[in-house]
Regions:
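Dinucleotide-binding Rossmann-like beta1-alpha1 core, especially the glycine-rich loop
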Residues: 1-75
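Local beta-strand N-terminus motif with an aromatic residue
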Residues: 3, 24, 200-201, 323
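Active-site/ligand-binding neighborhood in enzyme catalytic cores
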Residues: 35, 43, 70-187
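Conserved flavin/dinucleotide-binding core of flavoenzymes
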Residues: 48-52, 249, 266-385
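Short, well-ordered alpha-helix to beta-strand connector turns
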Residues: 168, 200-201, 356
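A structural signal for the hydrophobic beta-strands that form the central parallel beta-sheet
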Residues: 172-174, 205, 361
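Mid-domain catalytic core of redox enzymes
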Residues: 176-285, 290-298, 303, 311, ...
Length: 385
């Protein structure tokens, strides 16, 4: 019910795989099924995978395609805009609505009008700031970039966490609810289960912002962390009869935009990416529902919501078979949102860390929400300590 893949987009991920000696266990997606889909006029449409494909496709209107090339003449932003305002300014509204909004809905499940471009798409923001143009900046940086590559394991990403557990299991304490974090002189005191106390000089904290805000000794930080909102995500796994799917779904998945009026944010075609996860005559897919766009939908009766989702999927992929498997899970507080006040929040966290030596806050609400982001942050802090 968590991440479906991890992206190798930094050296820390490579180093972790090497340290755990699991390089031979890594599975990469089926190269023949690397397409991504959007919806246009109720039908699946492939996202172009090259500049040539993009020019020939009808994914954007001709005027929207022409508008993109004017990006190189637009002055860089003076301050941090929302994702919506940034892309509307540099590439045009249609580019945002058709390509950017569905993508970020799939990652953050949030509202692009309330997301900070500086923190949500940090690399794009930095390229614009450094080169004055996103297009020109990426052309100049292209040769230096690591080509991102996603991966998984035979039994899912639990293989990764299990390997980490095996390596450090003697140092882990399970079933331990932290009820307070205090500071006594130059030491930090952690109270567990309202009873057991631990004292340490160095502390790394990765718990969610809403949880840390309730137990931290610093009132200002507590109030700051409460400003971070989390959106709910309903995850639904479905098993289908492969031969009854009439439309081509040989790809990674499909993302939706608000105007599609679907009952889900996106679908991942799990068994098309990693064939081993389902029998050869079956298909496994993961449906994502909720986020800031569909919070009201999650208040619908669960059975009615399921029926609506299945109806939408049947129509989209032209499926007349049975639903042979169903498993679902609701994350009430699924994904932290990097809002327009995130600059202030990050600065307050840094101020706290500066005042409290060797206290490191490293949740996924700081400098990236992905697994690879968290691995990179952990690597950086481990070297500091």
């Amino acid at each position: 019910n968590g991440p479906n893949t991890v992206l190798i987009n930094n050296e820390s991920v490579r180093d972790l795989i090497s340290d755990l000696k699991i390089k031979n266990d890594v599975l990469y997606p089926n190269k023949n099924n690397n397409k991504r889909f959007l919806i246009k006029k109720g039908k699946l449409i492939k996202i172009p995978q090259s500049f040539g494909q993009f020019i020939k496709s009808n994914i954007l209107s001709l005027s929207a395609k022409i508008r993109i090339f004017f990006e190189i003449f637009i002055k860089k932003s003076d301050n941090s805009l929302s994702v919506y305002d940034f892309f509307k300014k540099r590439f045009g509204k249609e580019f945002h609505d058709v390509l950017i909004e569905p993508f970020l809905t799939g990652v953050y499940a949030g509202n692009t009008r309330k997301m900070s471009i500086k923190h949500v798409l940090k690399k794009i923001w930095e390229v614009e700031q450094n080169y004055g143009s996103v297009i020109l900046g990426f052309i100049k940086k292209k040769s230096r970039n690591i080509t991102p590559k996603s991966f998984n394991f035979k039994n899912g990403l639990s293989d990764l966490t299990n390997k980490i557990h095996q390596k450090i299991k003697d140092k882990i304490r399970f079933n331990s609810k932290i009820t307070s974090i205090s500071k006594i002189e130059n030491l930090y005191e952690i109270t567990v289960n309202n009873d057991i106390k631990y004292r340490c000089s160095k502390l790394i904290c990765t718990i969610p912002a809403y949880a840390l805000s309730e137990i931290i000794f610093d009132e200002k930080l507590s109030q700051t962390l409460k400003k971070i909102s989390y959106c709910p995500i309903y995850v639904l796994h479905l098993g289908l009869e492969k031969q009854k799917i009439k439309n081509d779904i040989s790809g990674f998945g499909v993302l939706t935009k608000p105007s599609d009026n679907k009952s889900f944010l996106g679908i991942i075609f799990n068994s098309r990416i990693f064939p081993h996860v389902a029998p050869s005559d079956k298909d496994l897919m993961t449906v994502m529902v909720g986020g800031t766009r569909q919070e009201q939908l999650l208040k619908t009766d669960k059975d009615l919501l399921f029926d609506k989702i299945v109806r939408d999927i049947r129509k989209l992929i032209s499926y007349d078979g049975r639903i042979i498997m169903k498993h679902d899970f609701l994350w009430d507080k699924g994904i932290p949102q990097y809002g327009l006040d995130h600059d202030y929040i990050i600065n307050e966290i840094k101020n706290f860390e500066n005042k409290n030596k060797d206290f490191h806050i490293m949740g996924n609400y700081v400098n990236g929400i992905s697994v690879s982001d968290c691995i990179e942050k952990a690597s950086v802090v481990s070297k500091i300590l």
